[in-house]
Protein backbone atom coordinates (compact mmCIF):
# COMPACT_ATOMS: atom_id res chain seq x y z
CA UNK A 1 0.00 0.00 0.00
CA UNK A 2 1.44 3.38 -0.93
CA UNK A 3 1.80 5.86 1.91
CA UNK A 4 -0.24 8.99 1.08
CA UNK A 5 2.12 11.27 2.97
CA UNK A 6 5.11 10.08 0.92
CA UNK A 7 3.14 10.67 -2.28
CA UNK A 8 2.19 14.16 -1.15
CA UNK A 9 5.82 15.13 -0.72
CA UNK A 10 6.82 14.19 -4.24
CA UNK A 11 3.51 14.67 -5.98
CA UNK A 12 3.26 17.09 -8.86
CA UNK A 13 0.03 19.01 -8.82
CA UNK A 14 -2.13 17.99 -11.80
CA UNK A 15 -5.21 19.71 -13.10
CA UNK A 16 -8.38 18.52 -11.41
CA UNK A 17 -9.73 17.04 -14.67
CA UNK A 18 -6.71 14.71 -15.10
CA UNK A 19 -7.01 13.46 -11.52
CA UNK A 20 -10.67 12.60 -11.96
CA UNK A 21 -10.08 10.95 -15.35
CA UNK A 22 -7.42 8.71 -13.78
CA UNK A 23 -9.84 7.99 -10.98
CA UNK A 24 -12.48 6.99 -13.53
CA UNK A 25 -10.15 4.56 -15.36
CA UNK A 26 -8.97 2.86 -12.21
CA UNK A 27 -12.49 2.48 -10.84
CA UNK A 28 -13.54 0.65 -14.02
CA UNK A 29 -10.44 -1.55 -14.12
CA UNK A 30 -10.43 -2.93 -10.61
CA UNK A 31 -13.30 -4.47 -8.72
CA UNK A 32 -12.02 -3.97 -5.18
CA UNK A 33 -13.74 -0.95 -3.66
CA UNK A 34 -13.75 1.04 -0.47
CA UNK A 35 -16.03 3.71 0.92
CA UNK A 36 -15.12 7.37 0.75
CA UNK A 37 -16.12 8.79 4.08
CA UNK A 38 -14.57 12.19 3.65
CA UNK A 39 -16.54 13.44 0.70
CA UNK A 40 -17.05 17.17 0.87
CA UNK A 41 -19.79 19.40 -0.38
CA UNK A 42 -19.28 21.01 -3.75
CA UNK A 43 -19.09 24.51 -2.30
CA UNK A 44 -16.43 23.53 0.26
CA UNK A 45 -14.16 21.90 -2.32
CA UNK A 46 -14.60 24.77 -4.70
CA UNK A 47 -13.43 27.29 -2.08
CA UNK A 48 -10.19 25.36 -1.53
CA UNK A 49 -9.14 25.13 -5.18
CA UNK A 50 -6.05 27.14 -6.05
CA UNK A 51 -7.02 29.90 -8.43
CA UNK A 52 -10.56 28.56 -8.84
CA UNK A 53 -13.71 30.59 -8.52
CA UNK A 54 -17.03 29.21 -7.38
CA UNK A 55 -19.39 28.32 -10.20
CA UNK A 56 -22.72 26.57 -9.64
CA UNK A 57 -22.62 24.01 -12.43
CA UNK A 58 -21.89 20.28 -12.68
CA UNK A 59 -20.61 18.82 -15.92
CA UNK A 60 -21.35 15.20 -16.79
CA UNK A 61 -18.28 13.33 -18.03
CA UNK A 62 -20.20 10.81 -20.14
CA UNK A 63 -19.57 11.64 -23.74
CA UNK A 64 -23.02 10.64 -25.01
CA UNK A 65 -24.95 12.94 -22.72
CA UNK A 66 -26.42 15.94 -24.50
CA UNK A 67 -26.28 19.49 -23.27
CA UNK A 68 -30.02 19.53 -22.52
CA UNK A 69 -29.77 16.43 -20.28
CA UNK A 70 -26.81 17.92 -18.56
CA UNK A 71 -28.70 21.12 -17.70
CA UNK A 72 -31.74 19.15 -16.51
CA UNK A 73 -29.71 17.07 -14.05
CA UNK A 74 -27.85 20.03 -12.58
CA UNK A 75 -30.47 20.82 -10.00
CA UNK A 76 -30.97 17.16 -9.01
CA UNK A 77 -27.30 16.60 -8.40
CA UNK A 78 -26.90 19.76 -6.39
CA UNK A 79 -29.88 18.72 -4.27
CA UNK A 80 -28.40 15.25 -3.74
CA UNK A 81 -25.12 16.81 -2.58
CA UNK A 82 -26.93 18.99 -0.02
CA UNK A 83 -29.82 16.86 1.28
CA UNK A 84 -29.95 18.46 4.72
CA UNK A 85 -30.14 22.08 3.60
CA UNK A 86 -33.55 23.70 3.57
CA UNK A 87 -34.79 25.90 0.77
CA UNK A 88 -34.35 29.08 2.76
CA UNK A 89 -30.81 28.08 3.71
CA UNK A 90 -30.08 27.17 0.12
CA UNK A 91 -31.04 30.66 -1.02
CA UNK A 92 -28.71 32.25 1.49
CA UNK A 93 -25.82 30.03 0.40
CA UNK A 94 -25.91 30.64 -3.33
CA UNK A 95 -22.62 30.13 -5.04
CA UNK A 96 -20.88 33.03 -6.73
CA UNK A 97 -20.51 32.63 -10.49
CA UNK A 98 -17.07 32.34 -12.04
CA UNK A 99 -15.58 34.76 -14.52
CA UNK A 100 -15.19 32.06 -17.19
CA UNK A 101 -17.82 29.53 -18.22
CA UNK A 102 -16.49 25.95 -17.98
CA UNK A 103 -12.79 26.44 -17.17
CA UNK A 104 -13.41 26.44 -13.41
CA UNK A 105 -16.19 23.81 -13.17
CA UNK A 106 -16.03 20.75 -10.89
CA UNK A 107 -16.39 17.44 -12.79
CA UNK A 108 -18.32 14.67 -11.02
CA UNK A 109 -18.48 11.12 -12.30
CA UNK A 110 -21.92 9.49 -12.13
CA UNK A 111 -20.43 6.04 -11.48
CA UNK A 112 -18.49 7.50 -8.56
CA UNK A 113 -21.66 9.01 -7.20
CA UNK A 114 -23.48 5.66 -7.39
CA UNK A 115 -20.76 3.35 -6.17
CA UNK A 116 -18.64 5.77 -4.09
CA UNK A 117 -15.87 3.17 -3.94
CA UNK A 118 -12.29 2.91 -5.25
CA UNK A 119 -9.69 0.18 -5.35
CA UNK A 120 -7.37 -0.41 -2.40
CA UNK A 121 -4.24 -0.12 -4.54
CA UNK A 122 -5.19 3.30 -5.83
CA UNK A 123 -3.08 6.13 -4.31
CA UNK A 124 -5.11 8.84 -2.68
CA UNK A 125 -5.17 12.11 -4.64
CA UNK A 126 -3.67 15.18 -3.07
CA UNK A 127 -5.96 16.92 -0.62
CA UNK A 128 -7.61 19.96 -2.08
CA UNK A 129 -7.87 21.63 1.32
CA UNK A 130 -4.13 22.38 1.50
CA UNK A 131 -3.00 23.33 -2.02
CA UNK A 132 0.67 23.18 -2.84
CA UNK A 133 2.38 26.56 -2.60
CA UNK A 134 5.97 26.93 -3.70
CA UNK A 135 8.28 28.20 -0.92
CA UNK A 136 10.26 31.31 -1.75
CA UNK A 137 13.14 31.96 0.73
CA UNK A 138 13.79 35.43 -0.67
CA UNK A 139 10.20 36.44 0.04
CA UNK A 140 10.55 35.27 3.65
CA UNK A 141 13.76 37.31 4.10
CA UNK A 142 12.01 40.43 2.83
CA UNK A 143 9.11 39.83 5.21
CA UNK A 144 11.51 39.36 8.15
CA UNK A 145 13.30 42.63 7.29
CA UNK A 146 9.98 44.46 7.18
CA UNK A 147 9.05 43.02 10.57
CA UNK A 148 12.37 44.15 12.07
CA UNK A 149 11.85 47.67 10.74
CA UNK A 150 8.35 47.78 12.18
CA UNK A 151 9.58 46.72 15.64
CA UNK A 152 10.58 49.88 17.44
CA UNK A 153 13.45 49.85 19.89
CA UNK A 154 12.21 50.34 23.46
CA UNK A 155 12.99 53.59 25.29
CA UNK A 156 14.84 52.96 28.54
CA UNK A 157 13.90 54.60 31.81
CA UNK A 158 17.20 56.35 32.59
CA UNK A 159 15.99 57.50 36.02
CA UNK A 160 15.04 54.04 37.24
CA UNK A 161 18.18 53.54 39.35
CA UNK A 162 17.86 56.99 40.94
CA UNK A 163 14.35 56.40 42.27
CA UNK A 164 15.63 56.21 45.87
CA UNK A 165 18.07 59.11 45.46
CA UNK A 166 16.41 62.23 46.83
CA UNK A 167 19.09 64.47 45.27
CA UNK A 168 18.27 63.20 41.78
CA UNK A 169 14.77 64.76 41.95
CA UNK A 170 13.32 62.01 39.78
CA UNK A 171 9.79 63.31 40.32
CA UNK A 172 10.67 66.69 38.81
CA UNK A 173 13.54 65.96 36.44
CA UNK A 174 11.37 65.76 33.34
CA UNK A 175 9.62 69.02 34.21
CA UNK A 176 13.00 70.66 34.82
CA UNK A 177 14.34 69.80 31.39
CA UNK A 178 11.08 70.74 29.72
CA UNK A 179 11.50 74.14 31.35
CA UNK A 180 15.13 74.33 30.22
CA UNK A 181 14.09 73.71 26.62
CA UNK A 182 11.51 76.47 26.78
CA UNK A 183 13.91 79.02 28.25
CA UNK A 184 17.10 78.12 26.36
CA UNK A 185 16.15 80.49 23.55
CA UNK A 186 16.91 83.36 25.91
CA UNK A 187 20.48 82.04 26.17
CA UNK A 188 20.98 82.29 22.42
CA UNK A 189 22.50 85.34 20.78
CA UNK A 190 22.30 86.59 17.17
CA UNK A 191 24.89 85.04 14.88
CA UNK A 192 25.93 88.44 13.53
CA UNK A 193 26.25 90.26 16.83
CA UNK A 194 29.96 90.86 16.13
CA UNK A 195 28.93 93.13 13.27
CA UNK A 196 27.92 95.83 15.76
CA UNK A 197 31.29 95.68 17.52
CA UNK A 198 33.56 98.32 16.02
CA UNK A 199 36.81 97.41 17.82
CA UNK A 200 36.75 93.65 18.38
CA UNK A 201 36.29 90.58 16.16
CA UNK A 202 35.36 86.93 16.42
CA UNK A 203 39.06 86.00 16.50
CA UNK A 204 39.57 88.19 19.57
CA UNK A 205 36.61 86.50 21.20
CA UNK A 206 38.17 83.10 20.47
CA UNK A 207 41.47 84.19 22.08
CA UNK A 208 39.61 85.38 25.18
CA UNK A 209 37.59 82.15 25.56
CA UNK A 210 40.66 79.96 25.01
CA UNK A 211 42.52 81.89 27.75
CA UNK A 212 39.57 81.69 30.16
CA UNK A 213 39.41 77.89 29.73
CA UNK A 214 43.01 77.72 30.96
CA UNK A 215 42.23 80.06 33.87
CA UNK A 216 39.19 77.97 34.77
CA UNK A 217 41.35 74.83 34.83
CA UNK A 218 44.07 76.49 36.96
CA UNK A 219 41.51 77.58 39.57
CA UNK A 220 39.90 74.10 39.44
CA UNK A 221 36.43 75.53 39.12
CA UNK A 222 33.23 73.64 38.38
CA UNK A 223 32.20 72.86 34.81
CA UNK A 224 28.98 74.84 35.21
CA UNK A 225 31.06 77.95 35.88
CA UNK A 226 32.89 77.77 32.55
CA UNK A 227 29.74 77.47 30.44
CA UNK A 228 27.98 80.24 32.34
CA UNK A 229 31.04 82.49 31.89
CA UNK A 230 30.97 82.12 28.10
CA UNK A 231 27.20 82.63 28.07
CA UNK A 232 27.50 85.90 30.01
CA UNK A 233 30.22 87.16 27.65
CA UNK A 234 28.21 86.48 24.49
CA UNK A 235 25.01 87.95 25.88
CA UNK A 236 26.83 91.06 27.05
CA UNK A 237 28.72 91.59 23.79
CA UNK A 238 25.49 91.19 21.81
CA UNK A 239 24.03 94.19 23.70
CA UNK A 240 27.00 96.38 24.51
CA UNK A 241 29.84 97.69 22.34
CA UNK A 242 33.22 97.11 23.98
CA UNK A 243 36.65 98.58 23.26
CA UNK A 244 39.48 96.18 22.51
CA UNK A 245 41.43 97.05 25.66
CA UNK A 246 38.37 96.27 27.81
CA UNK A 247 37.63 92.84 26.30
CA UNK A 248 39.80 90.91 28.76
CA UNK A 249 38.16 92.81 31.62
CA UNK A 250 34.74 91.67 30.37
CA UNK A 251 35.98 88.08 30.47
CA UNK A 252 37.33 88.39 34.02
CA UNK A 253 34.12 89.95 35.33
CA UNK A 254 32.01 87.28 33.60
CA UNK A 255 34.14 84.64 35.33
CA UNK A 256 33.70 86.39 38.68
CA UNK A 257 29.91 86.55 38.30
CA UNK A 258 29.72 82.90 37.25
CA UNK A 259 31.78 81.89 40.29
CA UNK A 260 29.46 83.83 42.58
CA UNK A 261 26.49 82.03 41.05
CA UNK A 262 27.87 78.47 40.88
CA UNK A 263 30.84 78.05 43.24
CA UNK A 264 31.01 77.55 46.97
CA UNK A 265 34.47 79.11 47.23
CA UNK A 266 34.80 82.21 45.03
CA UNK A 267 38.13 83.69 43.86
CA UNK A 268 38.79 87.12 45.29
CA UNK A 269 39.05 90.16 43.05
CA UNK A 270 42.79 90.50 43.72
CA UNK A 271 43.36 87.04 42.22
CA UNK A 272 41.68 88.13 39.01
CA UNK A 273 43.80 91.27 38.90
CA UNK A 274 46.93 89.16 39.25
CA UNK A 275 46.07 86.73 36.44
CA UNK A 276 45.41 89.71 34.16
CA UNK A 277 49.03 90.75 34.79
CA UNK A 278 47.66 93.79 36.63
CA UNK A 279 46.23 95.24 33.44
CA UNK A 280 43.18 96.29 35.46
CA UNK A 281 42.59 97.52 38.98
CA UNK A 282 40.13 96.39 41.61
CA UNK A 283 38.01 99.46 40.85
CA UNK A 284 37.91 98.53 37.15
CA UNK A 285 36.64 95.05 38.00
CA UNK A 286 33.89 96.27 40.33
CA UNK A 287 32.80 99.00 37.91
CA UNK A 288 32.51 96.54 35.00
CA UNK A 289 30.58 94.16 37.25
CA UNK A 290 27.89 96.81 37.76
CA UNK A 291 27.71 97.56 34.03
CA UNK A 292 27.41 93.88 33.07
CA UNK A 293 24.69 93.07 35.61
CA UNK A 294 22.72 96.15 34.59
CA UNK A 295 23.00 95.28 30.88
CA UNK A 296 21.87 91.69 31.49
CA UNK A 297 19.12 92.88 33.85
CA UNK A 298 20.54 90.61 36.57
CA UNK A 299 19.31 87.58 34.64
CA UNK A 300 21.87 84.91 35.50
CA UNK A 301 19.69 81.81 35.68
CA UNK A 302 19.58 80.61 32.11
CA UNK A 303 20.29 77.06 30.88
CA UNK A 304 23.68 76.49 29.27
CA UNK A 305 25.09 73.47 27.42
CA UNK A 306 26.25 71.76 30.60
CA UNK A 307 22.95 70.64 32.22
CA UNK A 308 21.83 69.29 28.84
CA UNK A 309 25.17 67.51 28.43
CA UNK A 310 24.79 65.75 31.78
CA UNK A 311 21.27 64.59 30.95
CA UNK A 312 22.14 63.40 27.44
CA UNK A 313 25.21 61.48 28.65
CA UNK A 314 22.93 59.68 31.07
CA UNK A 315 20.55 58.82 28.23
CA UNK A 316 23.50 57.46 26.23
CA UNK A 317 24.53 55.27 29.20
CA UNK A 318 28.00 56.72 28.92
CA UNK A 319 31.22 55.59 30.53
CA UNK A 320 34.08 57.81 31.67
CA UNK A 321 35.73 57.91 28.24
CA UNK A 322 32.56 59.10 26.54
CA UNK A 323 31.98 61.77 29.20
CA UNK A 324 35.48 63.23 28.89
CA UNK A 325 35.49 63.14 25.09
CA UNK A 326 32.07 64.82 24.89
CA UNK A 327 33.31 67.54 27.28
CA UNK A 328 36.41 68.02 25.12
CA UNK A 329 34.32 68.45 21.97
CA UNK A 330 31.82 70.85 23.51
CA UNK A 331 34.62 73.03 24.92
CA UNK A 332 36.11 73.21 21.44
CA UNK A 333 32.72 74.51 20.34
CA UNK A 334 32.83 77.22 23.03
CA UNK A 335 35.88 78.79 21.37
CA UNK A 336 34.40 78.83 17.86
CA UNK A 337 32.21 81.88 17.19
CA UNK A 338 30.27 80.08 14.43
CA UNK A 339 28.81 77.66 16.97
CA UNK A 340 26.78 80.38 18.73
CA UNK A 341 24.09 79.84 16.08
CA UNK A 342 23.06 76.55 17.71
CA UNK A 343 20.96 76.32 20.89
CA UNK A 344 22.60 74.80 23.99
CA UNK A 345 20.60 71.56 23.84
CA UNK A 346 21.61 70.93 20.23
CA UNK A 347 25.29 71.52 21.01
CA UNK A 348 25.11 69.10 23.94
CA UNK A 349 23.35 66.41 21.90
CA UNK A 350 25.86 66.85 19.07
CA UNK A 351 28.80 66.49 21.45
CA UNK A 352 27.42 63.18 22.74
CA UNK A 353 26.65 61.90 19.24
CA UNK A 354 30.07 62.92 17.87
CA UNK A 355 31.84 61.35 20.84
CA UNK A 356 29.97 58.08 20.26
CA UNK A 357 31.01 58.04 16.61
CA UNK A 358 34.61 58.92 17.51
CA UNK A 359 35.01 56.09 20.02
CA UNK A 360 33.05 53.33 18.29
CA UNK A 361 33.54 54.30 14.65
CA UNK A 362 29.81 54.24 13.91
CA UNK A 363 26.60 55.88 15.06
CA UNK A 364 24.92 54.65 18.24
CA UNK A 365 22.11 57.20 18.37
CA UNK A 366 19.28 54.96 19.58
CA UNK A 367 15.64 55.60 20.45
CA UNK A 368 16.48 56.36 24.10
CA UNK A 369 18.91 59.13 23.10
CA UNK A 370 16.45 60.54 20.60
CA UNK A 371 13.60 60.49 23.12
CA UNK A 372 15.46 62.34 25.88
CA UNK A 373 17.44 64.68 23.62
CA UNK A 374 14.49 65.52 21.33
CA UNK A 375 16.81 65.43 18.29
CA UNK A 376 17.00 62.85 15.53
CA UNK A 377 20.30 61.82 14.01
CA UNK A 378 19.64 63.85 10.86
CA UNK A 379 19.08 67.01 12.91
CA UNK A 380 22.55 66.65 14.45
CA UNK A 381 24.58 66.08 11.29
CA UNK A 382 25.19 69.71 10.30
CA UNK A 383 26.46 70.73 13.73
CA UNK A 384 28.31 67.42 14.03
CA UNK A 385 30.39 68.07 10.91
CA UNK A 386 31.46 71.46 12.26
CA UNK A 387 32.44 69.83 15.54
CA UNK A 388 34.47 67.14 13.76
CA UNK A 389 36.39 69.82 11.84
CA UNK A 390 37.19 71.56 15.12
CA UNK A 391 38.48 68.25 16.45
CA UNK A 392 40.62 67.69 13.36
CA UNK A 393 42.55 70.93 13.82
CA UNK A 394 42.46 71.10 17.64
CA UNK A 395 46.13 70.17 18.08
CA UNK A 396 47.51 72.18 15.18
CA UNK A 397 45.44 75.36 15.37
CA UNK A 398 46.78 78.63 16.78
CA UNK A 399 44.54 78.27 19.82
CA UNK A 400 45.36 74.98 21.54
CA UNK A 401 44.26 75.67 25.12
CA UNK A 402 41.47 73.08 25.05
CA UNK A 403 43.67 70.46 23.40
CA UNK A 404 46.45 70.94 25.99
CA UNK A 405 43.94 70.70 28.82
CA UNK A 406 42.55 67.36 27.63
CA UNK A 407 45.99 66.00 26.75
CA UNK A 408 46.89 65.81 30.45
CA UNK A 409 46.67 62.77 32.73
CA UNK A 410 43.83 64.47 34.62
CA UNK A 411 41.58 63.86 31.60
CA UNK A 412 43.07 60.54 30.55
CA UNK A 413 44.99 62.00 27.55
CA UNK A 414 41.69 61.88 25.71
CA UNK A 415 42.67 64.55 23.17
CA UNK A 416 45.58 62.46 21.88
CA UNK A 417 44.00 59.03 22.28
CA UNK A 418 41.21 59.34 19.69
CA UNK A 419 41.35 60.71 16.18
CA UNK A 420 38.48 62.75 14.80
CA UNK A 421 35.54 60.89 13.24
CA UNK A 422 36.59 61.63 9.65
CA UNK A 423 33.84 59.47 8.16
CA UNK A 424 31.20 61.94 9.40
CA UNK A 425 32.79 64.71 7.33
CA UNK A 426 33.31 62.52 4.26
CA UNK A 427 29.63 61.49 4.32
CA UNK A 428 28.65 65.12 3.68
CA UNK A 429 29.85 65.05 0.06
Curated annotation (Swiss-Prot):
SUPFAM superfamilies: Cyclin-like. GO terms for molecular function: cyclin-dependent protein serine/threonine kinase regulator activity. Gene3D superfamilies: Cyclin-like (1.10.472.10). Residues 68-80 have a biased composition (Basic and acidic residues). Residues 66-98 are annotated as: Disordered. It comes from the Eukaryota. Expressed in roots. PROSITE patterns: CYCLINS. One of its GO terms (biological process) is mitotic cell cycle phase transition. Pfam families: Cyclin_C (PF02984), Cyclin_N (PF00134). Keywords: Cell cycle, Cell division, Cyclin. Belongs to the cyclin family. Cyclin AB subfamily. Interacts with CDC20-1 and CDC20-2. This is Cyclin-B2-2. It comes from Arabidopsis thaliana (Mouse-ear cress). The lineage of its organism: Eukaryota, Viridiplantae, Streptophyta, Embryophyta, Tracheophyta. The gene is CYCB2-2.
Amino acid sequence: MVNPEENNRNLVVKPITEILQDDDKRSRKFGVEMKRQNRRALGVINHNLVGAKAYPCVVNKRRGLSQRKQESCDKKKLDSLHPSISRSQEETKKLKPSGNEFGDCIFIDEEEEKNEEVTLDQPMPMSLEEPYIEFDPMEEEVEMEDMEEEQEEPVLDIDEYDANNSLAAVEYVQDLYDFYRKTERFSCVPLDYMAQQFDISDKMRAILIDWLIEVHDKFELMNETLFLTVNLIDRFLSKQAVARKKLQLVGLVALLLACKYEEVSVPIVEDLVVISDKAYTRTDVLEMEKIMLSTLQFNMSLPTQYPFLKRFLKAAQSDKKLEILASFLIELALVDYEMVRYPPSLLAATAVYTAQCTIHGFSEWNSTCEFHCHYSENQLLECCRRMVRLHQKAGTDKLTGVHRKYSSSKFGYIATKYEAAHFLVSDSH
